[in-house]
């Protein structure tokens, strides 16, 4: 009889622990809300500038000038090999990956400016559809 009570208490403790862990877990829905503040970092200043412009035109997020002000960080790694390709991931301020986006290249958008074209392709084909698909 006493054994059953101990088992029930242990099970209850376990369930409460799981519920509390689940309540603290965050996913993309929690970060990618309208009005979220994003800090953009990249190995290329022009990619940062074009991304800021694209986010401003989109009007869904707001860009900030420091990681401390941001809700999340958008890391954009630009590489050139025939076309500009951007590998993107959204990360938390403590460097946990929220979402990795498929890499996009400047060929996809046929823009005269290859960096701007790669940014445009990334946002138009990956980031914006993913974000709007969450809600």
Segments predicted by a language model, with ranges:
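Structural recognition of the beta-strand scaffold that forms the well-ordered cores
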Residues: 37-40, 65, 75
